[in-house]
Swiss-Prot record:
Keyword list, A-Z: Autophagy, Cytoplasm, Protein transport, Transport
Disulfide bridge map: none
Renumbered residue ranges of the record's region ATG17-binding: 399-407
Region (ATG1-binding): 428-487
Designated gene of the protein: ATG13
The name this protein goes by in its record: Autophagy-related protein 13
Main subcellular localisation: cytoplasm
Subcellular location(s) of the protein: Cytoplasm; Preautophagosomal structure
Species the sequence originates in: Ogataea parapolymorpha (strain ATCC 26012 / BCRC 20466 / JCM 22074 / NRRL Y-7560 / DL-1)
Free-text function comment from the UniProt entry: Activates the ATG1 kinase in a nutritional condition dependent manner through the TOR pathway, leading to autophagy. Involved in ATG9 and ATG23 cycling through the pre-autophagosomal structure. Also involved in cytoplasm to vacuole transport (Cvt) and more specifically in Cvt vesicle formation. Seems to play a role in the switching machinery regulating the conversion between the Cvt pathway and autophagy. Finally, ATG13 is also required for glycogen storage during stationary phase.
Disruption phenotype: Leads to derepression of several genes involved in xylose catabolism including PDC1, DAS1 and AOX1, and subsequent increased ethanol production from xylose.
Amino acid composition bias (Low complexity), ranges on this chain: 332-344, 595-631
GO biological process: mitophagy; piecemeal microautophagy of the nucleus; protein localization to phagophore assembly site; protein transport
Sequence similarity: Belongs to the ATG13 family. Fungi subfamily.
Start-end of Polar residues biased regions: 506-532
Length: 700
């Protein structure tokens, strides 16, 4: 059995589930017990037209009774929407559960007055009076690793719930609720109700009378109780309550309140309670004004000494409205008075009700520690003694004494000091069982009270799934790191560079060209490469129309300057001189004669004749090649042969062109035939290029 109690032993998966179920039902059952004693159930007083505020009419009848922790409270339960935060399976992120019991004043009419022990309570612009506040929390900083037997934990919780059941029935708020339920007027103007709050958020007293505000001149108007915590291997279950000690509220009409004071002169004891100077109240109006003016403190302000004592009480009055105008905590005198009040230990002092406040002065001077203070201030005092300071972002959870420096609308309640302790961020304790439990339940590393409003307790799971999705996808390649984008343009550039080097070498073999030719050659490289590709790919389409596939540029149509740009196309023939191609010298000579500025009519006629003979020879060659039974002859070869003959004949005709006879003809026909001569020369040049490239294509 000793091995079971070793701290090093971890919880199994089944044990973790059982422990989580126990802790979750602890929150739900505690809320059910408190509501059972604070809210009137439908079977008791609720009618179809009744309105009981927050939770009075929101109970639902369940199919089965909740018998957790050996306590059966009937088949009425709190709606699931009210406890949705505490029904979460992740128990490590459960926020503190706060149950607030309040007196609803919304039903009070203008001719009704709320009274507490025959004292009129000012309820203007107030709709609620907080009666008590319960705090249920799961503290991860306190644990016991040796408590590994869950039946023992369950039995301890049963004892705690019996104590809670007994305590909830003994508090003053339950007596008030029981009195209102048993009263003859079921439709009373006031009723007790309860609400559920998230303890991780600030609790303000805007529009209501908070728990820290006094309604009578009592030494202590609030008290607190704490039940023994239940230790588990991963944390401690705690229950505490802060409540008003006097809840004798009742509703009276304004006329009844005045008529009941006509016999005050015959009651000296009552008269001295309200008239400390011995002066009798002759009229009910004087009595009413005196009661209203001294509702919080029954002291007269006729003597200066009494006025000074009144100011002292107001200075240390917890949650006082008049104390909100005190200087800020940066003042030296205020800090001294606050520190002397908060760091001292309470000394019980009994103040008797007398008709004079002179005896209060030495008591207040000697024993300022006897003034009533709230639970939150006591918790803050303990934190100051241990050297801990509340962070600046937790000032909204300061004690009720700190409400002196705030407005009435932002004044917090007296239980905020406990919420500071519960919600202060602390480092995760060195608890191996807690770490094992967190890993099994996949809970986050921090509780939900430390997360922001936009945070999710399943954020880690979403992040893991996102990372797995990224790992399953292949790596992305960015364009800046990939050289494949530039492969095609680089290959084209290298091809153009090779052709440029080839043409440059060819021109150097024939001699250095002039600057004008170099410029024209550089401008026509792109068009020549495109012409060469189209010639190789479309052989048959050129037979019908020679000039359709080779569209000359705007520079090639000009005579003289544009003629040399065709030279690289013509000089391809020098690589195939053995196959019958025209020689370079004859072609160069022809181009030199042809590039002269004037063009004669004889040259034009010669060009026309050569084209006709070229066409007829091509047709005869095609006919003979079709009828022959031997190997078909390539028509391009025949076309090239006839073209060579025409070129030599036209060259001879040009030598005869220098005679006087031809000169006269030239002078007569220059004008009308100049336009036709340019077109014929262009056709001839393209025909020559066609023949030369076709020959090269055949050799390839």
């Amino acid at each position: 059995m000793s091995s079971v109690r070793r701290p090093s032993k971890l919880l199994s998966e089944k044990q973790s589930d059982k422990l989580a179920q126990i802790i979750q039902n602890f929150f739900l059952k505690a809320a059910h017990v408190i509501f059972h004693f604070r809210v009137a159930f439908p079977s008791v007083v609720l009618q179809p037209d009744d309105s009981y505020g927050a939770m009075g009419d929101s109970f639902a009848q369940s199919k089965y009774n909740n018998r957790w922790f050996n306590l059966d409270l009937g088949n009425y339960e709190i709606p699931r929407t009210e406890l949705s935060l505490w029904r979460n399976k992740d128990i490590l992120s459960l926020p503190p559960l706060v149950l607030e019991t309040f007196l609803d004043l919304r039903g009070l009419s203008s001719n009704q007055t709320l009274m507490l022990d025959d004292v009129i309570v000012k309820t203007s612009k107030k709709s609620e009076i907080v009666l008590e506040r319960w705090l249920i929390e799961f503290d991860l900083s306190t644990f016991d690793n040796e408590v590994m037997e869950f039946p023992s934990i369950y039995k301890k919780i049963i004892i705690l719930f019996r104590s809670l059941y007994l305590l909830a029935g003994l508090l003053p708020s339950y007596k008030l609720r029981d009195k209102l339920v048993k009263s003859k007027s079921k439709n009373s103007a006031i009723h007790v109700s309860c609400r559920i709050l998230d303890g991780s958020k600030p609790i303000t007293s805007k529009g209501r009378i908070g728990l820290s505000k006094k309604l009578l001149s009592e030494d202590e108007h609030t008290s607190s109780k704490k039940l023994q915590p239940i230790l588990t291997p991963i944390g401690a279950l705690r229950v505490s309550v802060s409540y008003r000690t006097n809840c004798n509220f009742q509703v009276s009409d304004n006329e009844e309140a005045l008529s009941s004071q006509f016999m005050l002169d015959h009651l000296p004891s009552v008269r001295t309670n309200y008239d400390s100077d011995g002066n009798s109240l002759t009229s009910p109006m004087d009595y009413l004004q005196n009661r209203v003016s001294s509702a919080s403190i029954h002291l007269s302000d006729q003597s200066p000494r009494r006025r000074s004592s009144t100011r002292s009480v107001q200075l240390f009055k917890v949650g006082s409205i008049n104390s909100s105008s005190s200087p800020p905590p940066g003042a030296t005198q205020s800090n001294q008075s606050v520190s002397s009040f908060s760091t001292s230990k309470p000394i019980p002092v009994t103040l008797n009700k007398t008709n004079s406040s002179a005896s209060l002065v030495p008591i207040l001077r000697q024993n300022r520690d006897s003034l009533p203070k709230s639970i939150g201030s006591m918790v803050q005092n303990q934190m100051q003694e241990t050297g801990h300071q509340v962070s600046s972002n937790s000032r909204r959870f300061s004690s009720s004494f700190g409400s002196r420096f705030r407005t009435v609308s932002s004044r917090n309640n007296s239980l905020d000091g406990q919420l500071v302790v519960a919600n202060q961020p602390f480092s995760t304790p060195n608890n191996p069982i807690l770490h094992n439990f967190r890993s099994r339940n996949k809970s986050p590393s921090v509780s939900s009270t430390e997360l922001g409003p936009s945070s999710s307790i399943y954020m880690d799971d979403d992040l893991d799934s996102f990372m797995k999705m990224l790992d399953s996808k292949p790596d992305l390649r960015f364009p800046s790191n990939s050289p494949s984008v530039y492969e095609d343009p680089l290959a084209n550039f290298k091809t153009f560079q090779k052709s440029n080097d080839f043409l440059t070498l060819e021109q150097q073999q024939h001699g250095s060209p002039s600057s004008n030719q170099i410029m024209i050659h550089s401008q026509s490289q792109t068009s020549q490469s495109q012409v060469f590709k189209r010639t190789v790919s479309s052989d048959r389409s050129r037979r019908g129309s020679v000039s359709s596939n080779y569209s000359p540029s705007s520079q090639a149509l000009r005579p003289g300057v544009s003629a040399p740009m065709v030279t690289p196309s013509v000089t391809y023939g020098k690589f195939h001189a053995s196959s019958g191609s025209p020689s370079n010298s004859s072609l160069a000579q022809y181009l030199r004669h042809n590039s002269s500025p004037p063009a004669s009519a004889t040259a034009v006629a010669t060009v026309h004749n050569s084209l006709r003979r070229l066409t007829s020879s091509s047709q005869r060659t095609n006919t003979n090649s079709t009828n022959s039974s031997t190997r078909p002859v390539n028509p391009e070869l025949l076309k090239l042969k006839s073209f060579n003959e025409d070129v030599f004949e036209s060259d001879d005709d040009e030598h005869d062109e220098h005679s006087p006879r031809s000169t006269d003809t030239k002078s007569r026909n220059t004008g009308p035939s100049s336009g036709h001569a340019e077109d014929d020369e262009d056709d001839l040049l393209f025909a020559m290029s066609d023949m030369t490239l076709a020959k090269n294509n055949q050799e390839f």
